[in-house]
């Protein structure tokens, strides 16, 4: 049933060799270092760290969530489409509220946000002694506008490896 060396169907010759090699490569692929992903809401702790360390917010800073935030010409939604209403930064963090983190990310600003990413080692490979480590896929700082920063603040529009995020 689950034998990676056996094919489910009959092929022959070069196709068989290629398919077998593809299966072996897939079986031995280390997704923790070879693949990147958007960290999503788990990344909000990084944005929170940047905001708190730069004194941009306190735990009691007040925000409002109507279920979305308009950034430039884009409507970016919260997972709670009816909104969380009035909330503090601490409550917004507990609610994993995208509009709160959009506001916070924009207050932190691009330069400080990238400085925090660099400080945490998220802009370069870890240097782990395992072959095939992928690197961060992220906008160049000069190309980051409000929309990009807004979505990055809650872990979208860039990619890192799981090992980088440890």
Map each language-model feature to its residues.
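Beta-lactam-recognizing serine transpeptidase/beta-lactamase-like catalytic domain environment
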Residues: 1-41, 46-166
């Amino acid at each position: 049933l689950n034998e990676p060396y056996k094919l489910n169907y009959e092929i022959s010759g070069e196709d068989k060799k290629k398919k077998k090699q593809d299966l072996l490569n897939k079986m031995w692929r280390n997704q923790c270092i070879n693949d990147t992903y958007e960290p999503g809401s788990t990344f909000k702790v990084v944005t929170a760290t940047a905001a708190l360390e730069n004194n941009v917010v306190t735990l009691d800073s007040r925000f409002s969530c109507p279920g979305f935030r308009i950034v430039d010409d884009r409507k970016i939604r919260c997972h709670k489409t009816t909104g969380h209403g009035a909330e503090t930064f601490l409550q917004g963090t507990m609610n994993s509220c995208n509009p709160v983190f959009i506001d916070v990310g924009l207050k932190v600003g691009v330069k400080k946000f990238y400085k925090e990413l660099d400080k945490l080692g998220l802009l370069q490979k870890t240097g782990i002694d395992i072959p095939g480590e992928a690197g961060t896929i992220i906008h160049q700082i000069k190309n980051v506008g409000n929309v990009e920063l807004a979505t990055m603040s809650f872990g979208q529009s860039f990619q890192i490896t799981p090992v980088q995020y440890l």
